[in-house]
Amino acid sequence: MKANEIRDLATSEIELKVKSLKEELFNLRFQLATGQLENTARIREVRKAIARMKTVIREREISANN
């Protein structure tokens, strides 16, 4: 999901998506440790998606304070 698409979502929706992505990341790391993960690039994709969403949330916090 791109940053522009994330900005169109409500903050509560973004937080829910972050939560679900963190759960997915946990499962991916578990699969990696047990040798079951085939697509290791997915870990990087999920981490970057979480970072994008957290960035948008932080931008909103900063703009609300100004």
Swiss-Prot record:
Q: Which UniProt keywords apply?
A: Ribonucleoprotein, Ribosomal protein
In the UniProt record, the gene name given for this protein reads: rpmC
Gene Ontology biological process: translation
Q: Which Pfam families match?
A: Ribosomal_L29 (PF00831)
Q: Which GO terms describe its cellular component?
A: cytosolic large ribosomal subunit
GO function terms (MF aspect): structural constituent of ribosome
The family assignment reads: Belongs to the universal ribosomal protein uL29 family.
User: InterPro entries per the record?
Assistant: Ribosomal_protein_uL29, Ribosomal_uL29, Ribosomal_uL29_CS, Ribosomal_uL29_sf
What name does the UniProt record give this protein? Large ribosomal subunit protein uL29
Q: Which organism is it from?
A: Lysinibacillus sphaericus (strain C3-41)
The reply to whether Ribonucleoprotein figures as a keyword in the UniProt entry is yes
